[in-house]
């Protein structure tokens, strides 16, 4: 019989028993894999000594080519070479079409509106393309480390929603990787800098990659990383800089903007090379076709200024959400290859009033942090464990009567988290309840995003408001949501794992947050009106039900007419938009029915006690 070896508490495995785990930065433009070796977290090279793997996959009839050679073939074979696939993860075909001018692929819609890319090898989903990249990184790691991996920590943008996170986990599973945890990229950067520098205090993580931007405000204490607030833009990055330069070339050369896919890829490669050279040079010569011209760093600054300004706007909002002042932030960590652009570093330094930290290679810092966390989760870490506290980017809640959004877990709540809230029935004899799960910051359902619906059946028939339904929202460490509903008296229960088929459209998260600020006053007024309208309807139904049962028996005609008049007035006001008037009329109807309610209670008590002796009542 096989025996399981169990280490004593507090004892780390021996060096030769070290479990192999890696951190993976699955980026829009480039990807890396890193591991802790001899106590130091470092990126792992391929056979040629290269650390960075371009996030590019070229499909041939019988095989997939990943990395540098695939990216080099993008211009000559654009339809079979997939780059920036991270932008497609967890999205629907309609969302992807909005990026059509940036993505020269032939798309076809699959099940659940998922986009598929037509290649010579057949249809490929974004999940499959990402899996090919992850598989290449897994093979590199196992070759370098000399053994099979027990798992990986994979980083994702903090702004990735549930669908995008689930798509990332699916890609890892296809690649044969056990996901120890999905880790927000800014948090991974904090892990790297926190351990390397012993940093404490408030820190901003400015993460500008190829296709996404994240800003996170963290409180760092020894061994504890708490995300106070996050923000960003799912469609902002170095790719936009490249497109701006490409647009400038087209304008300067007097060319048509309607380029074929191959020419488009070639122009973008030229633009990217010019951008990278301008990091160290004041100006560069750009040549495309028969045209050539001089691109200065000053011109580049002008071209990218709108994108830099967008990132700074997100920074200010994140600082405001965190409840701290700009002056309190001690340092800014720069993450992502796009932060090498001088204008970006200058603008960030001016906003936060300090020189940005660039001690660790901005291309490597996320993978290094993920490797440190993977090492800890694999059980290799000695001494004090890391405590990572991520947050959810948008509030989660459900629909209540009147089309109102009731927030159960507010945005920027630390995860993992479970929150429960009790709700009740709206109508007498109600035996089922539809649970509508929502995401967003607005007060009305129509302004929020629907995540899922499920039904709770078997609720015992009761008068309205008597049943107690406890709804529990549970978000795990990967940011994935589960919702359950339970009727407390009967124990009937229903639940759902929220797995939407595609994610938010480009910029929708940012728009939802912006709208929540812009329409805050209007939303509160609309919510107050809906709440009073719902309360008015509830009261009218309750009074009418009571009148039908006991009106003739307990009220004289004058009392019935007085109540009816107040009910008519409330019905009329409830159809309008005067919140205060509805509230006042609810009070008047309640007052005029107080005596009726008291008589009904007396009659109920009298009926309950009828025929019983005093000693029976006392017992």
UniProtKB/Swiss-Prot annotation:
A biological process from GO: protein refolding
Gene: hscA
Species: Pseudomonas aeruginosa (strain ATCC 15692 / DSM 22644 / CIP 104116 / JCM 14847 / LMG 12228 / 1C / PRS 101 / PAO1)
Protein name from the UniProt record: Chaperone protein HscA homolog
Gene3D superfamilies in UniProt: 1.20.1270.10, 3.30.420.40, Actin, Chain A, domain 4 (3.90.640.10), Substrate Binding Domain Of DNAk, Chain A, domain 1 (2.60.34.10)
InterPro entries on file: ATPase_NBD, Heat_shock_70_CS, HscA_NBD, HSP70_C_sf, HSP70_peptide-bd_sf, Hsp_70_fam, ISC_FeS_clus_asmbl_HscA
One Gene Ontology CC term in the entry: cytosol
Signal peptide: none
GO molecular function: ATP binding; ATP hydrolysis activity; ATP-dependent protein folding chaperone; heat shock protein binding; protein folding chaperone; unfolded protein binding
Pfam families: HSP70
Family recorded in the similarity comment: Belongs to the heat shock protein 70 family.
Summary of the function given for this chain in its UniProt record: Chaperone involved in the maturation of iron-sulfur cluster-containing proteins. Has a low intrinsic ATPase activity which is markedly stimulated by HscB.
NCBIfam families, sorted: HscA, PRK05183.1
Keyword terms, alphabetized: ATP-binding, Chaperone, Nucleotide-binding
